[in-house]
Amino acid sequence: MLYCLGEPFESLCRRLREAPVEHVELVNDGWHTLDRERVAKLKEIGESKGFTYTMHAPFADINIAAPVPKARQFVFRRLEESLKHALDLECRLIVFHPGMRTGISDFYPGADWKINVESVKKLLKLSRDYCVDIAIENCPEPFGFLLKNVEQFSSFFDELDEDIGLVLDVGHSNINGQTCAFIEAFSSRIVHVHAHDNDGKQDLHLGVGNGTVDW
């Protein structure tokens, strides 16, 4: 429910009760950040509506490749909280973003890439502990994410050498001009799709068919 993230949590609940859908992706961030009380309310709504939930992990101020260990400790506390909430909500999976370059990345060539891989391995272990699947999303240009294109993901999957799913964000891959390339390269890894549209230049999150994606 990213489109209503700027609305109060109570508005999200109202929209959920009225939504004519079977599947909902919750965003654990901003005004919709979860706690026990909110999880209980979402669980009640989900059971009454017959929803299947997935969850988007926090992404504001979250960088799994942060070079400072204390910063990563904060990141992992937030992500582990999401895993706990996802378990309670019986979410099918959690979507998370890859790490990002920082203002000091150029001083330590390759360090953020290494930390990103190590962090994903740690997340995979946590996900197994909580019995909740996780999947990593392709992110858009021009932002400093470490994983945006097919070539980067190919290197990442080879180095990680673990079974992890890919969330294909079609809007993001459209900006990179690689939607078909992602599907051809990683068809066996794609476990979830974010379907939205744009002009091929900006991450506009338009409705399907309202941009340049060749659906």
Language-model features: where?
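A short acidic, helix-capping loop that chelates divalent metal ions and anchors anionic groups
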Residues: 61-66, 102-107, 142-143, 200-206
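Residue-level marker of alpha-helix boundaries and capping positions
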Residues: 3, 33, 73, 113-114, ...
